[in-house]
Amino acid sequence: MPAARRFPWLFLAILAFGAVADLVSKSIVFRVLPHEWDSQTVWAPFFYLKNQRNTGGVWGIGNGANGIFLILSIVAILAIVIYLSVAAFRGQRLPLPLAGILAGAFGNLWDRIQFGFVRDFLSVRIGSFHWPTFNVADSLICIGCAVMALGLLCAPEPE
């Protein structure tokens, strides 16, 4: 699994770029589409930008439970930071996918604290199938988890 060494510049770059990309993209889209449910076709009939406010978790599960998801986000971020601190202290390599996961968690946590909801805006449709609206932070979390899972599944057996 790719990892940052003692000075985790690549890890920090992924973390910073991911968090900034998420927050800036949300800010731009929500400035262009200021009202909830506003939408703009990007590539008909597949891809749209949409102002959607999510007070729940993934796919809107637990809608209205922003406080619970705010606490869960803080716990997840603290767990990752503690893990990274222990790994760095022991001189272990830092898994780069955690940088993306952490960046996404920070982006969505910022939204929950600042607005009381997560700003989702990427909407994908294929025929009658409509994927739940998401954002850059969600993508970073999913990609980070997928890369970590792949790394764990493909890692050689310890001797």
Feature-to-residue mapping (PLM):
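Alpha-helical transmembrane bundles and membrane-interface segments of multipass inner-membrane proteins
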Residues: M1-E159
